[in-house]
Swiss-Prot record:
Pfam family, one: DIOX_N
Name of the molecule in the record: Mugineic-acid 3-dioxygenase
Highest classification ranks of the organism: Eukaryota, Viridiplantae, Streptophyta, Embryophyta, Tracheophyta
Listed transmembrane segments: none
Superkingdom assignment: Eukaryota
Gene: IDS2
Domain Fe2OG dioxygenase: 180-283
Length: 338
C-alpha cells in the first residue's frame, strides 16, 4: 500500500512515465471563454430559453442563484480540501486500485486508456437514493459525511430542476426525467489535481463525454475545465459560486441527438492545485434508454440503439476512449462485437 500511495500524483517527486502523454495528443486550448451566466432567479421563460441556447451551443450551462447557498459551497470546498490535506497514511485506508470497489480513493482516473494515467486523485462516493445513507463513506474528516451528503442532495435538486426546465422547452411531459431515468445512485467524484511539473505533457482527465444523464460540477476557483468547441478546445473560466452543468450521453440518446454530450477534459497547471466536485445523475442500471417518441418521425428516424443502461456501460467500457458515441450506440453501426 505504501508503495502504491507513493506513486500517486500527490506524493510523486517526479512524473512517472505512465502519466506522460504524447505531445501530439495534447492540442492546447486556444481561447478563454466565460460560458453564458444563467441566473436561475430570473423569470422561468428567460431561464428555460437560456438553458436551451447554451446547451445547444456548448453542451454546457453555467448557473448562479441556483439554490445552494454560498456558505454551503464554502463548507463543501473546505471539507474536500481537508480530506486531501490529510497525511498519506490517513488516506491510505480509503485507497483502492479495484475499479469495482466503491467509496474509495484512487489515482490516475477510471478511464480505460491502454495503461495511460492522468494527473488526478479522486475520492469517489456513491450517494444512494432515496435514503441518502452515507455510513459507508470515509469517517475522516469528521464533517465529510454530513457536508458532502447535504451538498449532494442539493446538487441533485438543481439537476432535477434543470431537467424540468428542459422538459418544458422540449415539449416533454413534466415528469419525463423522474423515476429510473434519473434514479440511480448519484456518483460523486471529488477531484484533486496537484500542480504538475510538466503541464504540457499531462492531463488531469482525458477528452471524454460523460455517460450519465447530466453532470453537476462544482468547478473550484482554479481554471482547468476545457471543452471541445468548433474543432478546438476552449478554457472555461470559473465564476464564483456558480455550478457548471453538462449533458451526458443518456440525454443525447433520449433527445435523438437534439442535445449533445460534448467532449471535455481537465488541464493541469504548474502553479497551484485544483479541486472540483462532479455529481453524476445516473439512471438505474436496468433502465431502458432510447430516443423518445417526441424526437422521432418519418423524417427523423431513431439514430441510437435502445439499450439498458447496464448494457450501455459494458459497451462503453470496451470501446477506445477516442471513439465517438456513434461507434458505441448508433443504430446504423455495423461493427461486430459491440
Amino acid at each position: 500500500m505504501a508503495k502504491v500511495m507513493n506513486l500517486t500524483p500527490v506524493h510523486a517527486s517526479s512524473i512517472p512515465d505512465s502519466f506522460l502523454l504524447p505531445a501530439d495528443r495534447l492540442h492546447p486550448a486556444t481561447t478563454d471563454v466565460s460560458l453564458p451566466i444563467i441566473d436561475m432567479s430570473r423569470g422561468r421563460d428567460e431561464v428555460r430559453q437560456a438553458i436551451l441556447d447554451s446547451g445547444k451551443e456548448y453542451g454546457f450551462i453555467q448557473v448562479v442563484n441556483h439554490g445552494i447557498s454560498e456558505p454551503m459551497l464554502h463548507e463543501m470546498y473546505a471539507v474536500c480540501h481537508e480530506f486531501f490535506d490529510m497525511p498519506a497514511e490517513d488516506k491510505a485506508e480509503f485507497f483502492s486500485e479495484d475499479r469495482s470497489e466503491r467509496n474509495k480513493l484512487f489515482c490516475g482516473s477510471a478511464f480505460e486508456t491502454l495503461g495511460e494515467k492522468y494527473w488526478i486523485d479522486v475520492l469517489e462516493l456513491l450517494y444512494p437514493l432515496p435514503s441518502g445513507d452515507t455510513k459507508d463513506w470515509p469517517h475522516k474528516p469528521q464533517m465529510l459525511r454530513e457536508v458532502v451528503g447535504n451538498y449532494t442532495s442539493l446538487a441533485r435538486g438543481v439537476a432535477m430542476e434543470i431537467l424540468r426546465l428542459l422538459c418544458e422547452g422540449l415539449g416533454l411531459r413534466p415528469d419525463f426525467f423522474v423515476g429510473d431515468i434519473s434514479g440511480g445512485r448519484v456518483v460523486v467524484d471529488i477531484n484533486y489535481y496537484p500542480p504538475s511539473p510538466n503541464p504540457s505533457r499531462t492531463l488531469g482527465l482525458p477528452p471524454h463525454c460523460d455517460r450519465d444523464l447530466m453532470t453537476v460540477l462544482l468547478p473550484g476557483a482554479v481554471p482547468g475545465l476545457e471543452i471541445a468547441y468548433k474543432g478546438g478546445w476552449i478554457k472555461v473560466q470559473p465564476v464564483p459560486n456558480s455550478l457548471v452543468i453538462n449533458f451526458g450521453l443518456q440525454l443525447e440518446v433520449v433527445t435523438n441527438g437534439y442535445l449533445k454530450a460534448v467532449e471535455h477534459r481537465a488541464a493541469t497547471n504548474f502553479a497551484e492545485p485544483r479541486l472540483s466536485v462532479a455529481s453524476f445523475i445516473v439512471p438505474a442500471d436496468d433502465c431502458v434508454v432510447g430516443p423518445a417518441e417526441e424526437f422521432v418521425s418519418e423524417d427523423n428516424p431513431p439514430r441510437y440503439r435502445t439499450l439498458t443502461v447496464g448494457e450501455f456501460k459494458r459497451k462503453h467500457n470496451v470501446v477506445n476512449l477516442d471513439s465517438s458515441i456513434n461507434q458505441i450506440i448508433n443504430i446504423n453501426n455495423n461493427q461486430k462485437g459491440i
